[in-house]
Amino acid sequence: MDKQPATSWSIHTRPEIIAKYEIFERVGSGAYADVYRARRLSDGLIVALKEIFDYQSAFREIDALTILNGSPNVVVMHEYFWREEENAVLVLEFLRSDLAAVIRDGKRKKKVEGGDGFSVGEIKRWMIQILTGVDACHRNLIVHRDLKPGNMLISDDGVLKLADFGQARILMEHDIVASDENQQAYKLEDKDGETSEPPEVIPDYENSPRQGSDGQEREAMSKDEYFRQVEELKAKQVVRDDTDKDSNVHDGDISCLATCTVSEMDDDLGRNSFSYDADEAVDDTQGLMTSCVGTRWFRPPELLYGSTMYGLEVDLWSLGCVFAELLSLEPLFPGISDIDQISRVTNVLGNLNEEVWPGCVDLPDYKSISFAKVESPLGIEGCLPNHSGDVISLLKKLICYDPASRATTMEMLNDKYLSEEPLPVPVSELYVPPTMSGPDEDSPRKWNDYREMDSDSDFDGFGPMNVKPTSSGFTIEFP
């Protein structure tokens, strides 16, 4: 199959689709995909039809959702249509709300009614569902790479499901996506014949066997074992496709019901002047990946500094940012540019150096930019002053410079915070707003104000700077 985006044409002209689905209004549109609400003619089920114009995003999303079929906290793909010279069309379950809408509603309630926005029990239940979904990805060595509230969809009965896998990367080989150009539709069945609901109790991940998409049980993996396996995968050069050779922001700027929301990345499509050139950096024969993925506010330091050798840990940082936003109803690091993003992280965690992250000096952009020493970092506790020590301790396990120090999803699910009083509320007691977040509402803090700034330069707003030539280019120092 040609790996160039197919010519876009209306989904209404596809006979194999209109024979099975009654297509209603378009509910989302972007540069690389359109989403329609539709009804399955055989049983009246309301679904979302996602037509993807970009080969890379389509391949990734189909591959990941096929592997994760049956995971209770991952969006369901019922089937998909994909032929030579045609756009892929995914048939997804229709979910009308997302976590960004929940956070926005919580912020409104806090302003009108006072209080904290969410109860501790509500936050715990949301986090358990998020962690369970990400754990399913990581058990199958799938890196989502764009975790944020707008990509966490919610059913009417409170079940949260991860969505928008257009930037996902699979760190192991799967032969999932069919390549027969004569075949029109590929149907997926749930493993047990129906969609399972998430458990009302916290899963015992330490003692339960791990199960992959093939149904085979796997032993629980320690953190050391995980890192060993990832290094082996990199050494064996099993990252098989070349889809990271382009900037992977395709689904980041699309607003779609049941799939994704408008991203803050739309002013950041190009790489800034100090960033590692991912187009030149990515060498699939060496198992490298692009650093230009994910939404900036949730992007970890290793990506901000241009790393192309990373793993599941990038999702763990993003999880920490989502957790912090649930707690405070504000984004933790709402950077207006990549430099501003690094600056905000530095002001909270302190300067990045070998002491806090051994090996950080080898990051592609580490020597290209530096900030004055932060004498008194704000710290996570400074960002969330009204929260308990247990909450701060949990966040610090995710929001830390060294990727190897971040807690895995398994460790997070077994943390005492999630099992002690006050207990997580039942899923049925979670309030779900009737609609999902609209454009530019993925995180609530005045994003439109940021976008109205006169210049999109990463260097504006920082005052004086020192640019020094070096043998390999230049460095930028901010006082």
From Swiss-Prot:
Biased composition (Basic and acidic residues): 442-454
UniProt cross-references to Pfam families, sorted A to Z: Pkinase
Phosphoserine found at: S179, S208, S247
EC number(s) per entry: 2.7.11.22, 2.7.11.23
GO biological process terms held by the UniProt record: cell division; maintenance of root meristem identity; protein phosphorylation; regulation of cyclin-dependent protein serine/threonine kinase activity
Catalytic reactions of this protein: L-seryl-[protein] + ATP = O-phospho-L-seryl-[protein] + ADP + H(+); L-threonyl-[protein] + ATP = O-phospho-L-threonyl-[protein] + ADP + H(+); [DNA-directed RNA polymerase] + ATP = phospho-[DNA-directed RNA polymerase] + ADP + H(+)
Active site, per annotation: D146
Tissue: Highly expressed in suspension cell culture. Expressed at low levels in all plant organs.
All copies of domain Protein kinase, residue ranges: 21-418
Region (Disordered): 187-221, 434-479
Modified residues (Phosphothreonine): T290
Location of Phosphotyrosine modifications: Y32
Binding site for ATP: V27, G28, S29, G30, A31, Y32, A33, D34, V35, K50
GO molecular function terms listed in the Swiss-Prot or TrEMBL record: ATP binding; cyclin-dependent protein serine/threonine kinase activity; protein serine kinase activity; protein serine/threonine kinase activity; RNA polymerase II CTD heptapeptide repeat kinase activity
A GO CC term assigned to this protein in UniProt: cytoplasm
Family: Belongs to the protein kinase superfamily. CMGC Ser/Thr protein kinase family. CDC2/CDKX subfamily.
Protein name (Swiss-Prot/TrEMBL): Cyclin-dependent kinase F-1
Organism annotation: Arabidopsis thaliana (Mouse-ear cress)
